[in-house]
A protein has these predicted regions:
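PLP-dependent amino-acid enzyme catalytic core
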Residues: 1-128
Length: 128
């Protein structure tokens, strides 16, 4: 699951027997570790690094493209955190088991304006 402060990942790991993996979307892995540690010093959350640094809220063509691809599943994902989560997931498949549960944890209302930003700034058209 993608994380800002890691709160959802921390409490999911604390209260289930699942192996919980998260990806930093707001800061780097050190920032995320610190945030999680403040909530639970014994947290078992495993942090996976994205394939490259994405600055929060900035537009990246590859993030929009992966978002379009995963939305073909019939589920609309959020356009800021989820693309970083999926890029990280796909880059780290070798570290994960054969069964993966991706937790969709965020709203999609912001997608309207985020798509407009992509269309305006990067000249990307909605292919859905």
């Amino acid at each position: 699951m993608p994380s800002g402060t890691g709160t959802s990942a921390c409490y999911l790991a604390k209260h289930t027997d699942l192996r919980v993996f998260t990806a930093p979307c707001v800061g780097d892995s050190d920032y995320l570790k610190k945030q999680i540690y403040e909530l639970d010093k014994d947290s078992k959350v495993q942090i996976l690094n994205p394939p490259k640094k994405y600055h929060f809220g900035n537009l990246y063509k590859e993030l929009y493209e992966i978002w379009l691809e995963v939305c073909k599943s019939g589920v609309e994902f959020e356009l800021i955190y989820d693309p970083v989560g999926f890029m990280t997931l796909f880059a780290n498949l070798d570290k994960l088991g054969s069964e993966i549960l991706y937790i969709h944890q965020s709203g999609i209302l912001g997608n309207i304006t985020q798509k407009q930003r992509y269309e305006r700034k990067l000249k990307i058209k909605d292919h859905k």
